[in-house]
């Protein structure tokens, strides 16, 4: 029974982090793919895209999962599963820049 409570608490913490958007964003608005990733994505997906609360994105993994860039943009924009929607929090230009960064430069 105790194991079930601990697992439930861990799940609740994970959902809270996901609902909070997996990142903060400082006082200045990030404009480049790496800046946007660091500010909004790295908390869940890891500094180098190695994964954590969210799945691994680096090393080409995300491009394999979403061969069509527009499919990945749709997930970031609208959310999917535990991935929160970034519509209204990031501009379409910021979303495109961070997706391109994740697909091409993120080490993994």
Indicate where each model-derived feature is located.
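Bacterial signal peptide processing site
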Residues: 23-26
